């Protein structure tokens, strides 16, 4: 190679490098976070409330997420932290912020839109083409029938709250009647304890329901003594699920080490997609399945479905199904009517860029929660 040719090649390489660097710099600047905004919303009939977080970049690209609640003070702190940072830094969110999960969803939404790819592809998926779903019902009978007609093949049943400790046979008969309403519909069920039972009552219920093969017994009692939870797990083959009220990932690790967790349930409104994936990775090393908890709106549903499509140990996803038609219509108007539609027990994955939904901000304003 002649000296002239070498110089020309070096010059060409430097020009190309400068062009690539300029393009990367421009793209990074376009993804710099400029503004965060809160939209507290509430379903008109049930009163279920959550907070939508919109994150905008300097180029005008917007992403959306959800959290349970955030104050103006929380928003100001998040604005100070995120302003000027690139949307690609979603994994660095401060875990103690109430907005952490929502901002995580919103930033992944932005990165997906900028990349023209669904979020699950950014996360290495899809691991499946659809996600199994269940919904919680209040009471039995008509509520279970409504869920089945809506396409669900699994429901969550709230355990009857005992009037006192050690209810004995009468309580077991009441529980049996509740479960029979689901079995008569040929549906699977999750028994939701919601931490209402004492450890003794929880152990008794766990032993009683194992014959009916529940998907799992959710929050059978409060998370206190790991030895007590281990005893409940050892005395019944009914799988145990925890996570609805857990706010620190280390608690999942403690439960896994103690051998008293069969279904990990990180709250996607708190942990977001990234935090939930970290917990799922930890659970996978113990051969434990993941069924994320979700009590928010349709934006979180979209995030949960992308999460499901990225997890090898995903089990089933909870999706809220309001009893009132007005509430269901509000959710459909907010993010698209097909998003939360379930067919034969499965929800379809959103396939558009980012979270794959178009958020109607007029609906956010209409159902603003004072």
What are these regions (language model features)?
Residues 23-64, 68, 73-75, 327-328, ...:
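Structured beta-strand/loop patches that form or line metal/cofactor-binding pockets in enzymes
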Residues 65, 131-136, 155-157, 189-193, ...:
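Hydrophobic faces of well-ordered beta-strands that scaffold small-molecule active sites
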Residues 1-26:
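N-terminal export signals
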Residues 56-118:
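Metal- or metallocofactor-binding catalytic centers and their adjacent structured scaffolds
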Residues 73-75, 80-91, 224-346:
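Shared catalytic-loop signature of beta/alpha-barrel
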Residues 14-18, 329-370:
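C-terminal extensions of enzymes
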């Amino acid at each position: 190679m002649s000296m002239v040719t070498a110089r020309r090649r070096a010059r060409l390489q430097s020009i190309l490098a400068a062009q690539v660097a300029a393009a990367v710099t421009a793209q990074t600047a376009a993804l710099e976070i400029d503004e965060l905004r809160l939209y507290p919303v509430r379903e008109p009939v049930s009163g279920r409330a959550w907070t939508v977080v919109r994150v905008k970049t300097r180029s005008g690209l917007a992403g959306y997420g959800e959290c349970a609640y955030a104050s103006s003070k929380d928003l100001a702190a998040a604005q100070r932290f995120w302003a000027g940072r690139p949307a690609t830094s979603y994994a660095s969110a401060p875990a103690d912020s109430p907005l952490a999960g929502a901002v995580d969803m919103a930033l992944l939404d932005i990165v997906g839109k900028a990349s023209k790819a669904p979020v699950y592809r950014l996360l290495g998926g899809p691991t499946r083409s659809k996600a199994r779903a269940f919904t919680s019902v209040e009471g039995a009978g008509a509520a279970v029938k409504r869920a089945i007609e809506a396409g669900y093949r699994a429901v969550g049943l709230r355990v009857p709250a005992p009037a006192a400790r050690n209810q004995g046979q009468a309580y077991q008969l009441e529980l049996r009647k509740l479960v029979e309403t689901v079995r008569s519909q040929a549906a699977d069920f999750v028994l939701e304890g919601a931490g209402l039972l004492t450890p003794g009552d929880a152990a008794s219920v766990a032993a009683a329901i194992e014959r009916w093969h529940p998907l799992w017994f959710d929050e059978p009692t409060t998370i206190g003594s790991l030895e007590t939870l281990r005893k409940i797990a050892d005395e019944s083959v009914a799988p145990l699920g925890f996570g609805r009220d857990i706010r620190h990932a280390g608690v999942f690790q403690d439960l896994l080490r103690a051998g008293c967790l069969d279904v990990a349930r990180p709250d996607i409104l708190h942990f977001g997609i990234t935090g939930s994936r970290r917990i799922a990775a930890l659970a996978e090393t113990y051969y434990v399945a993941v069924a994320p908890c979700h009590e928010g709106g349709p934006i979180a549903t979209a995030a949960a479905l992308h999460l499901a499509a990225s997890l090898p140990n995903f089990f089933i996803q909870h999706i809220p199904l309001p009893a009132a038609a007005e509430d269901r219509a509000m959710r459909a108007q907010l993010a698209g009517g097909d998003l939360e539609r379930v067919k034969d027990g499965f929800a379809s994955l959103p396939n558009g860029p980012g979270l794959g939904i178009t958020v109607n901000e007029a609906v956010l304003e209409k159902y603003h929660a004072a």
